[in-house]
Amino acid sequence: MEHYNYNGKEIIGIDHGFGNIKCRHVVFRSGVKAYDSEPAMTSDALYYDGKYYVVGEEHKGFVSDKSQDEDYYILTVAALAKELEFRHITECEAVLAVGLPVQWIGAQKEAFRKYLMRNELIEFQYHGQDYLVRIDDVQVFPQGFAGVVQRLGDFKGLNILADIGNGTMNTMLIKDGKPISSRCYTDKLGVEQCIIRMSNELLAVSGFAMPYDVCEDFLRRGNAELAEKYTSVMR
């Protein structure tokens, strides 16, 4: 199994998306719901700091500052739980590698880093297993850039890097292998806006409001078990 360990520390990348939380080995929706007692209808609850949390049942709404509430912290703990379970690790020192939209990183980088580092020790329980994680460091990078940083030498002339997520689209101009900082943009244009437009078109044409999950599945797979009059509009 592929491990990411450097000087005895687990390197854990977490993409804190508006639609989904992504790690090396796990992906789940970014919604989170807290309960005072263990939920009866799920076996996938995270227990942390005296509460139970169910994640992954829905997407989180768009926010311009990911440190403005507790959700992304809980989602980070959930990401650690799922990723460490996959790696068969229950106790470790960890370095988190995370991202922010390219146009926000200058203003929000330090605040987001402090937000994720506020507790050095994190204890939680997941699937009946106790975990203990010591956060050694958090490193914040521009979203999307990590995907090409090792191949910048291949980018001759003018190139545009586009990272299209659920809530935002990040674009970066790369000239002869060098990112141009003045030509980096973050727009509130992502998959969610496509789904909203799709749903609005269906409502206007048929008077039927298609559920969000059905529209999302159609975008993912290109088909749905629906009448042609609906799928033709969705296309």
Roles of regions detected by a PLM:
Residues 1-161, 178-193, 205, 212-235:
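Nucleotide/phosphate-binding catalytic cleft detector across ATP-hydrolyzing
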Residues 164-170:
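Ser/Thr-glycine-rich phosphate-binding loops at phosphate-binding pockets of nucleotides
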Residues 171-176:
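PRPP/pyrophosphate-binding module of the type I phosphoribosyltransferase fold
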Residues 196, 200-204:
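Long, charge-rich alpha-helical interaction segments
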